[in-house]
Amino acid sequence: MCDDGFDQNWHERNGGNLSYRIKHEEVESVKEELSYDGKWQPVGASVPALSGEYFMVSGSGRFMRNMILEPETNCCIIEVDQTGENYRICWGLVKGGMPTSELPTHLMNHEVKMKATEGRYRVIYHAHPANIIALTFVLPLTDEVFTRELWEMATECP
């Protein structure tokens, strides 16, 4: 997904981030690759509905382009503790670093989305498409105008 976003010019430099709530069977299939020696860190938000969940998360300050080239350096798998208040890195970021600085926001959104969709939706993807950023300089910054302009650009939304 990060590579697709890069190929479509959705990211400037290290802009944007991604988190994926990993399915339980996917966690089981890679358990032997995970380490549980990592220090618990505060999430920065309370997300009790996500207790015990695992997430693949882009690293802070990492380029989306590099996710596919060196995933073990540029992203990580984290586990949320049983209180939903802390996380630890179980895999990745082998050259150091932290998960995205947007981690609290991502996890709060995952918690809401999980409840609202009975767990169907698993990805939070934050991008900085240059063409959308450019529109902020030429359009009035109102929801109505901006949304309408974006809809009109899509051929399937006349």
Regions from the PLM with identified roles:
Residues 1-158:
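Glycine-rich flexible loops
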